């Protein structure tokens, strides 16, 4: 009988060890997010890592958030990572990973040296109701055209992206149904198409229309009514870019 009791205690201890979840936890903006994996509370079932590396507006912005999550990953490991290239050498790199049973691996790196082709996608970016002025962007080898509308989980900020992307076909299929949540982000709409032969043209498409959304600004920063033109000054450009990231970071849209 004593042997049975001891075996039961060992089994219970083993279950406790298996059920414990350790995740790296840190949050940074424009700095490195490093931290040791620590044990999560009992309500957490997954580790989540999200990051954005962007040069929209001509300024570098880096955002990272690693945390324990009460959400269950749809698979043992769900990872989405891709870069969107836009006009004027602007880019938006998005990465998010949800893991169960272990801390996420830091494998979100952008592609190295690439060869430019004579194929193109129309590119632009917009925030909430701002205009998205399309311009042609030459693509690198292996890229396809994307049209992405994404927002943070709480709906406080929305971003629209068009351009050339290294997004994989499997990721396109995973996100294309719409309203797909990955980490802190909800991909409202994702379209992937093949690029066309390069031509130099510019068009303006209507702004994002969603009357239920309200403008979100960072405390202490005044923003004028959004109107983006190619002749906008660098000051206006910086204000517009800060507005984009200000609303994104209020959650805690590459992607």
Swiss-Prot record:
Name of the protein in its database record: Ly6/PLAUR domain-containing protein 8
Impact upon substituting residue 210 to D: In mutant N-D: Abolished N-glycosylation
Gene disruption: observed consequences: Mice are highly sensitive to intestinal inflammation induced by dextran sulfate sodium (DSS), due to the presence of bacteria in the inner mucus layer. Mice are healthy when raised in a specific-pathogen-free environment, in which bacterial contamination was strictly controlled.
Signal peptide extent: 1-20
Compartment(s) of residence: Cell membrane; Secreted
GO-annotated cellular components: extracellular space; plasma membrane; side of membrane
Lineage: Eukaryota, Metazoa, Chordata, Craniata, Vertebrata
Consequence when changing residue 72 to D: In mutant N-D: Abolished N-glycosylation
Record organism: Mus musculus (Mouse)
UniProt gene name: Lypd8
């Amino acid at each position: 009988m004593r042997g049975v009791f001891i075996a039961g205690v060992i089994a219970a201890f083993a279950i406790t060890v298996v059920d414990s979840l350790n995740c790296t936890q840190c949050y940074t903006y424009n700095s490195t997010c490093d931290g040791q994996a620590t044990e999560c509370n009992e309500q957490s079932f997954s580790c989540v890592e999200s990051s954005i590396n962007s040069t929209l507006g001509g300024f570098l912005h880096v955002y990272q958030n690693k945390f324990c999550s009460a959400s269950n990953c749809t698979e043992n490991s769900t990872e989405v990572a891709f870069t969107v290239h836009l006009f004027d050498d602007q880019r938006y790199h998005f990465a998010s990973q949800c893991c169960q049973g272990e801390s996420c691996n830091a494998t979100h790196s952008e592609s190295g040296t690439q060869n430019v082709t004579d194929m193109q996608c129309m590119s632009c970016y917009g925030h909430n109701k701002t205009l998205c002025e399309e311009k042609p962007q030459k693509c690198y080898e292996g890229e396809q055209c994307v049209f992405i509308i994404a927002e943070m989980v709480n709906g406080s900020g929305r971003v629209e992206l068009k351009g050339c992307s290294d997004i994989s076909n499997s990721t396109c299929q995973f996100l294309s149904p719409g309203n797909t949540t990955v980490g802190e982000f909800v991909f409202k709409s994702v379209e992937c198409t093949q690029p066309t032969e390069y031509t130099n043209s510019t068009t303006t498409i209507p702004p994002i229309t969603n009357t239920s959304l309200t403008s979100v600004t960072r405390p202490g920063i005044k923003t004028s009514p959004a109107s983006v033109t190619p002749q906008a000054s660098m000051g206006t450009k910086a204000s517009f870019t800060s507005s984009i990231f200000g609303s994104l970071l209020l959650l805690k849209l590459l992607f």
